[in-house]
């Protein structure tokens, strides 16, 4: 009956709209941290749909204080049981340093110690130019040399953070913008295959 179909759709739409009120988690109980780079097609690479996960993006896919804020909320109150950290090749956070960016803003007349970083926390201010440089969190300033290292570092930080439940599964991957594929950190298949001129003979 048409009326039964309509009633069923209305119920489905109501449940969808009231997910938070009814305590319904996202479809995969998943939170993803990745870079804001538009070349990272995160849903496609993970094989997920828009309703399957909470997606958090920032410059570099770095575990910042705000990333931790979101991760702690989704895992403690929204039913999330898995976190995936995805960095990517050719990331802009590898191309500059915090010092270069800080100098740019200073040349524009910005005074680091007078910058209000969080409008909701007026007391949270940078106390020195050095802290201003660190605040941008470019890979080099964090002692990180590759997206692989950053993915592993992000996983480690989240696993050891007191606001993230210990039963949450946390893994990291690297998205290759050249191939549009994910891989595990430090597992570069292309480099391995390119070492050999001939394939290995398969033995029976």
Curated annotation (Swiss-Prot):
Keyword Ubl conjugation annotated: no
UniProt KW Amino-acid biosynthesis keyword: no
GO terms of biological process kind: hydrogen sulfide biosynthetic process
Enzyme superclass (EC): hydrolase
Record-listed Zn(2+) binding positions: 35, 88, 91
Disulphide-bridged cysteine pairs: none
Cofactor binding, per record: Binds 1 zinc ion per subunit.
Keyword tags: Hydrolase, Metal-binding, Zinc
Gene3D superfamilies: Carbonic anhydrase
An example molecular function term from Gene Ontology annotations: zinc ion binding
Pathway: Sulfur metabolism; hydrogen sulfide biosynthesis
Coiled coil: none
Reactions mediated catalytically: carbon disulfide + 2 H2O = 2 hydrogen sulfide + CO2 + 2 H(+)
Entry cofactors: Zn(2+)
Mutagenesis or variant effect for residue 77 to A: Increases catalytic efficiency
Known EC number: 3.13.1.5
Family to which the UniProt record says this protein belongs: Belongs to the beta-class carbonic anhydrase family.
Subunit structure: Forms a hexadecameric catenane homooligomer, through interactions of two interlocked octameric rings. Exists as both octamers and hexadecamers in solution.
Biological role: Catalyzes the conversion of carbon disulfide into hydrogen sulfide and carbon dioxide, with carbonyl sulfide as an intermediate. Likely plays a key role in sulfur metabolism that allows Acidianus sp. A1-3 to grow on carbon disulfide as the main carbon and energy source. Does not show carbonic anhydrase activity (hydration of CO(2) to carbonate).
Protein name per the record: Carbon disulfide hydrolase
Species for this entry: Acidianus sp. (strain A1-3)
Gene from which this protein is expressed: csh
């Amino acid at each position: 009956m048409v009326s039964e179909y309509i009633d069923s759709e209305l119920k489905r739409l109501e449940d969808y709209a009231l997910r938070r009120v009814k305590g319904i988690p996202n479809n995969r109980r998943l939170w993803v941290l990745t870079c804001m780079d538009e070349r990272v097609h995160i849903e496609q690479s993970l094989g997920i749909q828009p309703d399957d996960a909470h997606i958090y993006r920032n410059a570099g896919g770095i575990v910042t204080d705000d990333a931790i804020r979101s991760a702690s909320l989704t895992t403690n109150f929204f039913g999330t049981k898995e976190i995936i950290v995805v960095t990517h090749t050719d990331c802009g956070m590898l191309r500059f340093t915090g010092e270069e960016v800080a100098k740019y803003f200073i040349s524009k007349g910005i005074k680091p110690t007078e910058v209000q970083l969080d409008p909701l926390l007026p007391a949270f201010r940078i106390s020195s130019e050095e802290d201003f440089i660190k605040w941008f969190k470019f890979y080099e300033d964090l002692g990180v040399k590759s997206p692989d290292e950053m993915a592993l570092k992000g996983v480690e930080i989240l696993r050891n953070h007191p606001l993230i439940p210990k039963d949450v599964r946390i893994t990291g991957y690297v998205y290759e913008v050249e191939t549009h594929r994910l891989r595990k950190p430090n597992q570069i298949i292309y480099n391995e295959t390119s070492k050999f001129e001939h394939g290995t003979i398969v033995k029976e």
